[in-house]
């Protein structure tokens, strides 16, 4: 079956805007997609009319629109397992007062499905839909433990690129870290994806296979030994709760695959 070029191009525009931290000009969009403005204009106008993107005349830039938010919420509402996990995450935040994430693996990257915000004024700002290479995050390390070094090298043919000076960039060092994750039952991100941010995560398994991961992130200045102890205790407890539900029920897990 052939891909419809115009539809595919519209989706590429949305993916590009989602990948950016800031809105983009039409020139930037066209340069990224290697497309002329004449062919992009009808696509942009259609996305604007349907509210999939918005336009800011003051900065002459485009950003994601409310239609995507609505569709995303409706999508999540259809999956009881995500609603259940979200309730567990809210409980985690009430205990630890830090930001909680639930994610799956999408090729070489972490796919953030859910986020429960910290109650603190200073908190994490990563959004749903953000992607990070799995090797640089605690969430990702939890899901890479099932991979061999050959498989991981295939995931990252250009090597392990640093996001911060503390990112692991050596495959052998990463494999040692993943072995430690298997042994300890949790993974660490010690300022490897963001400077001044600490993260701890646990794998979520069903029938012995890792299908997702759950994490708590906190600014480094709040990450005391007592805070880490509370975070790990809470994550491991809630991991058991979620896994029991997954293993005891016939829930549809297609959203996690």
Q: Which positions does each model-derived feature cover?
A:
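Extended hydrophobic
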Residues: 166-241
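Short, highly charged C-terminal tails/helix-capping segments
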Residues: 248-257
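N-terminal helix-turn-helix
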Residues: 1-76, 82-83
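Amphipathic alpha-helical regulatory segments at dimerization interfaces
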Residues: 32, 84-95, 184, 241, ...
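Short amphipathic alpha-helical signal-transduction/dimerization elements
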Residues: 18, 140, 144, 148, ...
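A structural signal for short hydrophobic beta-strand segments in well-ordered beta-sheet cores
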Residues: 53-55, 102-103, 204
